[in-house]
Amino acid sequence: MAKMTTLKMKEKLEKELQAPNRQFSYNRDNDTLTVAQNGKKVTLTIPQIIANFENDGNAAVEKIVYYVEEGFRAAAGNVELENNKASIYPVVRATSFPDETKAGEALLTDDHTAETKIFYAVDLGKSYRFIEESMLKKAQLTHKEIREVAFNNLANLEIPLKKDSVNGNDFYFVRTNDGYDASRLLNEAFLREMREKLTGEMVLAVPHQDVLIIGDIQDNTGYDVLAHMTMDFFADGLVPITSLPFVYNNGKLEPIFIMAKNRLKE
C-alpha cells in the first residue's frame, strides 16, 4: 500500500467531509486542516490522523469524520439548560484549551490544576455542547448551580475498571468511551476509595478525554511504564489533555514529571 502523505490525507478528509456551506483551509506550516461551517470551526492535525490511519486504517478517518459531523450538529442546536439538568457534566480539558467560542462567547469554566481546566457541557447523546456563560442568564441559573448539578450527575456514572500489572505495579483503566472517562478524575469520592485500596503511590493520568489511568506505583519501573503509556495515549487521542501524570496525596492532585526510569519530583 502506498504511503499516506499529508496532501493525500488532506484530500481524503476534504472528500469525506464535503458538504454544502462548508469550507476548508489548509495551514502548510502547521499541517492542519480547518473545517468551517456556519461560523463554527474544527481544526484537524493531519500528522496525528496519519499516525492513527497507519494503525487502524480507514476506521481512523471514519472516527474523525464522525467527530467533526457530530461537533457541527451540536454547535447548531439550541440547548435549554433548565430542561436538561440531568444531562450536564463537567469535562476536563488542557489549560491551553480555548475558553471562548470562535464567535467570542465565554465558556463556563473552573480552575482545576496547573495542567487541566474544568468546562461544563450538555450531553446530546452522541456529542455534547459546551455551556456558555450567556446561557446561564437565559436559564436563570448560577455558575454554582451548574457546578453542583454537573458533579452530582458525574457521581452517578459507573466506573468500570480494567486492571493490568507489570512487575508488581498495578494499573487500572477507565475506558467506557462515553465522553467522560477523563471527567471521572473529578469524582473525589472515587479517588478517596481508590487511595484506600492501593498500597503504593497513587498516580493518575488523563492523556485524552476517553481514558483515565490509575497507577498503584511500587517502584521506578512503575513510573517508567506509566510515563510510556501516558505518552502513547496522549499521541493517539482525538482530544489530548496532558501527558503529565498526577500524584494523589491528601485529597490533592499534583502534576509530576517522569523521565527515563526515575521519577523527578517538582
UniProtKB/Swiss-Prot annotation:
Q: Name one Pfam family in it.
A: DUF1444
UniProt xrefs under InterPro entries = DUF1444 (IPR010838)
Give the UniProt family note. Answer: Belongs to the UPF0354 family.
- The entry's protein name is UPF0354 protein Lm4b_01619
According to its UniProt entry, this protein's organism is Listeria monocytogenes serotype 4b (strain CLIP80459)
